[in-house]
Amino acid sequence: MGRKYVVLGLAVCLFLSSFNEVSCQAEGGIESSNSEFQGSFLEEGEVEVTKIESESQSSSSEQNTKLSMSEENQEDSFDVDKFIESEAVSSREELGQSSSMDEVNRDLEAILDSLNKRDGSDDISKVGESMDAAGIADERRQRLEDIERKLKAAAATNIVVEDGTSKRKSKVEETQEVVKFESESSSASSESRRQSSSSYNSFNKGTGGSEMLGSLGISQSGSWRCYNQDKNGVSEEEDTSIVIPKYDIDSIIKEESTSQGSSSKTSSLIASLTKIVEKHRKEKWSSGVSVSVTKGASSTQTSETVEKLKVTLKKYRGLSARELVARSDFEEILATAARYEELSSASVSHISRLSMYRSVIKEGIKASQRVQLAYARTRLLKEMAVEKQKNVDAELALVKALAERGDMLYVKIFAIKKLISKLEAEKYEVDMTFEKTVANLSRVIEEASQAYEEYHVVVRKWKEEQASEEFSREAIERVEMVWVEFLSTL
């Protein structure tokens, strides 16, 4: 019985050892097949990746519409990258991957790192540019508001200046009409004044020739007015001015024609005109005597005043007309110059012409200020447009970068999908092979168990034969010993 147990234990050990060897051989075959398959698959994957990259480069214009897909699959791409890296590491550790696959993995890692860095730098630069652009836009908005306020103020002042210029123009036109009317009236009455012209010209040389148009004038009512000068030389209208009523020559002729005959018409007309002229001469020279006496007393003071005004006006020689009009004391300067021309008996009144052009010069100054403001506004708007164009260029560059990254992710996703489909097909084949191998293993185990049973039967027979052989050997030895003992007795 003990021998049977020993033999049975040995048989069990042999069976287990054989089963272990069979399982190790099966695992080795599976691993070798897996390594061969993975190596071939990785090589095919590299070829396919290169083909896909070339196809994606040729069709990059058609894949710009897939940016939304890249945003949704961005997070999954990082997991897939990690999965690819882990699979690559495990395949290198287990299978000893080739150098070409290492280079491909390094290129993929470098591309991913550059894309991540580019995204970070683009985000940071975009945030910084947005902050700078916001600050610059606020400053420019404030400057534009200031310019608009200045333009509104300039427009208001322009309206006021236009009103002033229109009023001044109307005044100048009125004065020109008055001067024209006076010149016409003076030319019409030159015959009546011819007799007193020589004495009046001598008086006018003493009093100043600038009052020639204003000292004697005929208004629309027909009244003649004589002007005197005060101590300062400024002409003022006297309260007791001599007013001579206008005589109608036609009425006089009509009266003479009705009262007298046609033969005495000419003589009566001459007598009437002579009376009018004599009366006017007496009244005029009676008032002019007081004026000449007053002017003779103040002639020395007038010359001193002229010299003082000349010295004062010489200070403004270095100024241009634009600068002169822009001064705050322009009205005082203008009054001083007008007074100088009046006292110095200037033949041409330049100051009146300057006063006429004053509004034009001021309007030119305002226009230049408006031009400067408009130029500043144009420059600001140009800077804003340039900044907006820079933002457009930055956004376009970001769109291009995202499009390129989307193309690369699409290529990776496509390659991974093909890889997964091939792995699934390979897994199916491995499962089918595994099932077949398991069935074969069960059959082989049955055959091995039968062989071990036959072996155990043969061993048992061998042991029995060996036991019988030993028994026969012992019996032979005993017989030999008995035979020897028998022979020793002889």
From Swiss-Prot:
UniProt biased composition (Basic and acidic residues): 171-183
Chain intervals for the UniProt region annotation (Disordered): 43-83, 155-206
Regions annotated as coiled coil: 136-163, 433-465
Pfam families named among the record's database cross-references: MutS_II
Keywords assigned: Coiled coil, Signal
GO biological process: mismatch repair
Comp. bias intervals (Low complexity): 184-199
Single GO term (MF): ATP binding
UniProt name for this protein: NAI2-like protein
